[in-house]
Amino acid sequence: MIQQETYLTVADNSGAKRLQCIRVLGSNRRYAHVGDVVVASVKDALPNMGVKKSDVVKAVIVRTRHTLRRNTGNSIRFDDNAAVLINEDKNPKGTRVFGPVARELRDKNFTKIVSLAPEVI
């Protein structure tokens, strides 16, 4: 579960390395899960890339340490909390996605991120 002040690792090559969640988008929502969009601040970034430190960006959650339960009875959990930066059209800012992503992204119409990911769990 991602909430305000949560630190996230960035799972793409947009230039940012770490994010801090500012707000979970939605009507008065407190927690974000896989596939939810958050507003975040860039805390660490690579020089000469698309984003800079202290930029405010939108990101979609692709991995969480909180257990994700599926309708089939399975449950999965990842090793970190990770997000992918997106633009206003909900397309990823980077051209590559690192690490596995959850299958729930396909249900929430983030098919471009799913197609870029090396593994979908």
Curated annotation (Swiss-Prot):
InterPro entries: Ribosomal_uL14, Ribosomal_uL14_bac-type, Ribosomal_uL14_sf. GO terms for biological process: translation. Pfam families: Ribosomal_L14 (PF00238). The keyword rRNA-binding applies. It comes from the Bacteria. GO terms for cellular component: cytosolic large ribosomal subunit. CDD domains: Ribosomal_uL14 (cd00337). GO terms for molecular function: large ribosomal subunit rRNA binding; structural constituent of ribosome. Keywords: Ribonucleoprotein, Ribosomal protein, RNA-binding, rRNA-binding. Belongs to the universal ribosomal protein uL14 family. Binds to 23S rRNA. Forms part of two intersubunit bridges in the 70S ribosome. Part of the 50S ribosomal subunit. Forms a cluster with proteins L3 and L19. In the 70S ribosome, L14 and L19 interact and together make contacts with the 16S rRNA in bridges B5 and B8. This is Large ribosomal subunit protein uL14. It comes from Prochlorococcus marinus (strain MIT 9515). The gene is rplN.
